[in-house]
Design a protein with these regions (language model features):
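A short acidic, Gly/Pro-enriched loop at the edge of an enzyme's catalytic core
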Residues: 23-34
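Conserved SAM-binding loop
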Residues: 5-6
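A conserved beta-strand element that flanks and buttresses the S-adenosyl-L-methionine
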Residues: 35-36, 67
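Core SAM-dependent methyltransferase catalytic element
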Residues: 121, 125-149
Length: 149
Protein backbone atom coordinates (compact mmCIF):
# COMPACT_ATOMS: atom_id res chain seq x y z
CA UNK A 1 0.00 0.00 0.00
CA UNK A 2 2.79 2.43 0.84
CA UNK A 3 4.48 1.72 -2.50
CA UNK A 4 1.22 2.48 -4.31
CA UNK A 5 0.75 5.71 -2.32
CA UNK A 6 4.33 6.78 -3.04
CA UNK A 7 3.81 6.13 -6.74
CA UNK A 8 0.51 7.99 -6.95
CA UNK A 9 1.70 10.92 -4.82
CA UNK A 10 5.24 11.19 -6.23
CA UNK A 11 4.57 14.66 -7.60
CA UNK A 12 3.99 15.95 -4.04
CA UNK A 13 7.43 16.01 -2.38
CA UNK A 14 6.02 17.43 0.85
CA UNK A 15 4.07 14.21 1.55
CA UNK A 16 5.68 12.00 4.20
CA UNK A 17 4.94 8.37 4.96
CA UNK A 18 4.94 6.52 8.26
CA UNK A 19 4.82 2.74 8.56
CA UNK A 20 4.05 1.67 12.11
CA UNK A 21 1.73 -0.38 14.28
CA UNK A 22 -1.01 2.15 14.88
CA UNK A 23 -1.58 0.94 18.45
CA UNK A 24 1.89 2.02 19.54
CA UNK A 25 2.44 4.95 17.19
CA UNK A 26 3.04 8.27 18.93
CA UNK A 27 1.20 11.14 17.26
CA UNK A 28 3.72 13.66 18.55
CA UNK A 29 3.93 15.94 15.51
CA UNK A 30 1.42 18.35 14.08
CA UNK A 31 0.19 16.18 11.23
CA UNK A 32 -1.78 17.79 8.41
CA UNK A 33 -3.64 14.56 7.72
CA UNK A 34 -4.16 11.14 9.25
CA UNK A 35 -5.77 8.50 7.03
CA UNK A 36 -6.75 5.00 8.06
CA UNK A 37 -8.24 2.14 6.09
CA UNK A 38 -9.60 -1.13 7.47
CA UNK A 39 -7.55 -0.90 10.66
CA UNK A 40 -9.42 0.74 13.52
CA UNK A 41 -12.10 -1.96 13.52
CA UNK A 42 -9.43 -4.18 15.12
CA UNK A 43 -9.45 -2.13 18.33
CA UNK A 44 -11.30 -4.39 20.75
CA UNK A 45 -13.63 -1.98 22.56
CA UNK A 46 -15.50 1.24 21.98
CA UNK A 47 -13.41 2.83 24.73
CA UNK A 48 -10.19 1.93 22.88
CA UNK A 49 -11.62 3.48 19.72
CA UNK A 50 -12.59 6.70 21.54
CA UNK A 51 -9.14 6.98 23.10
CA UNK A 52 -7.53 6.40 19.71
CA UNK A 53 -9.65 9.13 18.12
CA UNK A 54 -8.45 11.43 20.90
CA UNK A 55 -4.82 10.50 20.15
CA UNK A 56 -5.37 11.28 16.48
CA UNK A 57 -7.01 14.61 17.31
CA UNK A 58 -4.14 15.53 19.62
CA UNK A 59 -1.61 14.66 16.89
CA UNK A 60 -3.19 16.83 14.21
CA UNK A 61 -2.19 20.41 13.53
CA UNK A 62 -5.06 22.92 13.74
CA UNK A 63 -6.98 22.50 10.50
CA UNK A 64 -5.59 18.97 10.07
CA UNK A 65 -7.92 16.28 8.76
CA UNK A 66 -8.65 12.71 9.79
CA UNK A 67 -10.49 10.29 7.52
CA UNK A 68 -11.19 6.64 8.17
CA UNK A 69 -12.38 3.99 5.71
CA UNK A 70 -13.69 1.08 7.71
CA UNK A 71 -16.33 -1.53 8.37
CA UNK A 72 -19.12 -0.12 10.53
CA UNK A 73 -22.20 -1.45 12.25
CA UNK A 74 -25.68 -0.34 11.32
CA UNK A 75 -27.59 1.91 13.68
CA UNK A 76 -30.08 -0.87 14.45
CA UNK A 77 -30.14 -4.66 14.45
CA UNK A 78 -32.56 -4.50 11.52
CA UNK A 79 -30.09 -2.49 9.41
CA UNK A 80 -27.14 -4.61 10.53
CA UNK A 81 -28.88 -7.76 9.30
CA UNK A 82 -29.46 -6.11 5.91
CA UNK A 83 -25.82 -4.97 5.73
CA UNK A 84 -24.51 -8.45 6.50
CA UNK A 85 -26.80 -10.04 3.92
CA UNK A 86 -25.66 -7.54 1.27
CA UNK A 87 -22.03 -8.19 2.18
CA UNK A 88 -22.55 -11.96 1.89
CA UNK A 89 -24.20 -11.48 -1.52
CA UNK A 90 -21.34 -9.26 -2.70
CA UNK A 91 -18.68 -11.77 -1.61
CA UNK A 92 -20.62 -14.65 -3.19
CA UNK A 93 -20.12 -13.03 -6.59
CA UNK A 94 -16.37 -13.64 -6.26
CA UNK A 95 -16.04 -16.75 -4.09
CA UNK A 96 -18.27 -19.71 -3.30
CA UNK A 97 -21.01 -19.41 -0.70
CA UNK A 98 -19.23 -22.17 1.25
CA UNK A 99 -16.07 -20.05 1.36
CA UNK A 100 -18.04 -17.00 2.46
CA UNK A 101 -19.70 -18.90 5.32
CA UNK A 102 -16.76 -21.17 6.13
CA UNK A 103 -13.89 -18.69 5.93
CA UNK A 104 -14.81 -15.01 5.62
CA UNK A 105 -17.72 -14.72 8.06
CA UNK A 106 -15.86 -16.63 10.83
CA UNK A 107 -12.75 -14.47 10.19
CA UNK A 108 -14.88 -11.32 10.47
CA UNK A 109 -16.48 -12.58 13.69
CA UNK A 110 -13.12 -13.55 15.22
CA UNK A 111 -10.99 -10.54 14.24
CA UNK A 112 -13.18 -7.51 13.62
CA UNK A 113 -14.82 -5.31 16.23
CA UNK A 114 -16.61 -2.60 14.25
CA UNK A 115 -18.63 0.05 16.04
CA UNK A 116 -21.84 1.81 15.08
CA UNK A 117 -21.10 4.57 12.60
CA UNK A 118 -23.40 7.02 14.39
CA UNK A 119 -21.52 6.44 17.67
CA UNK A 120 -18.16 7.07 16.02
CA UNK A 121 -19.35 10.35 14.50
CA UNK A 122 -20.62 11.40 17.94
CA UNK A 123 -17.29 10.51 19.61
CA UNK A 124 -15.39 12.56 17.06
CA UNK A 125 -17.65 15.56 17.66
CA UNK A 126 -17.32 15.21 21.45
CA UNK A 127 -13.51 15.11 21.12
CA UNK A 128 -13.54 18.38 19.21
CA UNK A 129 -13.50 17.48 15.52
CA UNK A 130 -15.56 19.83 13.36
CA UNK A 131 -17.10 19.27 9.94
CA UNK A 132 -17.58 15.62 10.91
CA UNK A 133 -19.32 13.85 8.07
CA UNK A 134 -19.67 10.65 6.06
CA UNK A 135 -18.26 11.16 2.57
CA UNK A 136 -19.10 7.67 1.27
CA UNK A 137 -21.08 4.71 2.54
CA UNK A 138 -22.22 1.42 1.11
CA UNK A 139 -24.02 -0.74 3.67
CA UNK A 140 -21.39 -1.73 6.28
CA UNK A 141 -18.48 0.11 4.65
CA UNK A 142 -17.99 3.85 5.19
CA UNK A 143 -15.51 6.68 4.79
CA UNK A 144 -15.93 9.37 7.41
CA UNK A 145 -13.90 11.95 9.23
CA UNK A 146 -13.47 15.51 10.33
CA UNK A 147 -11.17 18.45 10.93
CA UNK A 148 -9.27 19.48 14.03
CA UNK A 149 -10.30 22.93 15.23
Amino acid sequence: MIAMARSRLARYPQVGYVVSDFRSFEFNRGFDAVLSSLALLHLATDEEKKLFYQRIYDGLAPGGIFYNADVVLGSSEFLQEIYMERWRNFMSRNVSKDEVEGKWIPKYQAEDRPARLMDQLEWMTEIGFVDVDVIWKCYNFAVYGGVRR
